[in-house]
Amino acid sequence: MRKTHINVIGAGLAGSEAAYQIAKRGIPVKLYEMRGLKQTPQHKTDKFAELVCSNSLRGAAITNAVGLLKEEMRRLDSVIIKAAEYTQVPAGGALAVDREGFSDFVTKEVSNHPLVEVIREEITEIPQDELTIIATGPLTSDNLANKIREFNGADGFYFYDAAAPIIDANSINFDKVYKKSRYDKGEADYINCPMTKEEFQAFQEALISAEEAPLNSFEDLKVFEGCMPIEEMAKRGYKTMLFGPMKPVGLEYPDEYKGPRDGEFRTPYAVVQLRQDNASASLYNIVGFQTHLKWGEQKRVFQMIPGLENAEFVRYGVMHRNSYMDSPNLLKQTFQSRKQENLFFAGQMTGVEGYVESAASGLVAGINAAKLFNDEEVVIFPKITAIGSLPYYITHTDSKHFQPMNVTFGIVEELDGPRIRDKKERYTKVAERSLNTLTDIISKENLA
């Protein structure tokens, strides 16, 4: 195996993180990205780490599993977390970013590193005799996807992913909405569009009957629960949306609210939330409203939302096919291929789900590719850490029932001793144990 550099194929969240981790360890990187020459159906730019779905990296507190994962990544000097914090926009207890500023930051930070050579080229073959990380994401080009399937000897799996619409803030009718974060956590960062029972019923019926865009595939529609299209939720039952993205709890009317309401109830029957999408607050996305409706139908139905009667859509919601590997049979916990030690895979194609999780897989793959380059022992992060629980889960779960997975405390190893009943106290203890363990690993393995 030639060891003059490490190849990273794909400059998304995982690939950008992997390239950064390798370069900071003094190893030359060839970072291949086809966007700029050839686009995917979902990407709009040629920038690194483009966020094609939401602009939220989810919960920030370490008593939330993804918040703990972010803190672990911060301590491992993640460029993705650094970019997110630099381009953060208000979002209550969540970490949301200005999506363009975020991609700009990652692009500059990675491409300006003296050891990173960016090559705008489509890779159609898997390198055999060089250390390589493939992080081409769920929208891998057909040519390379076919080679990966051929290499793995399996068709792999797929699911459909969806993105929510983005609207112009100037087109919102602020007489019918109010600003508030759920349970008043943090600042009043969300715009809330309240619905009466009658308005909700009409909205649900319109969603159910709205015309969907055709799928570019003969396969059945399979969707990841975390990105369930809003129209699919509406079809699942009357209360599905009320316990999902339109949940009203913690979003009581402010005293000054003068719009329509059901009698004297303090809380709306349903609420649609809008989250700031860029630093200047000129754009907002409709939280949890991933959709596959035709664009004309999106405009018709979503303008039924109070305050959005004249909404101008900067981007309509879209759905795309995501592919992922049979990781339980194909990958090690280090994200190495079981078939070829010098080949790593990272990102959503491995079956981790979510922006933060994808970047975390790139971080682990990058660290271990660098270890292999230097003839050192690879690092297996223990499953008592969030960053170790994900690779353990995707490589040890039952292959027959394997589906994309977000980080949750359910996959982090339980605490020893009697179970602590109070969730916040229990998760605080889990987080403390995880961070203490990670501190020891960083010191022992010289990962800082």
UniProtKB/Swiss-Prot annotation:
Cofactor(s) listed in the protein's UniProt record: FAD
Intrachain disulfide bonds: none
GO molecular function: flavin adenine dinucleotide binding; tRNA (uracil(54)-C5)-methyltransferase activity, 5,10-methylenetetrahydrofolate-dependent
Superkingdom of the organism of origin: Bacteria
Top class in the EC scheme: transferase
Main location: cytoplasm
TM ranges: none
Subcellular location: Cytoplasm
NCBIfam families: gid_trmFO (TIGR00137), PRK05335.1 (NF003739)
Protein family according to the UniProt entry: Belongs to the MnmG family. TrmFO subfamily.
Name the UniProt record assigns to this protein: Methylenetetrahydrofolate--tRNA-(uracil-5-)-methyltransferase TrmFO
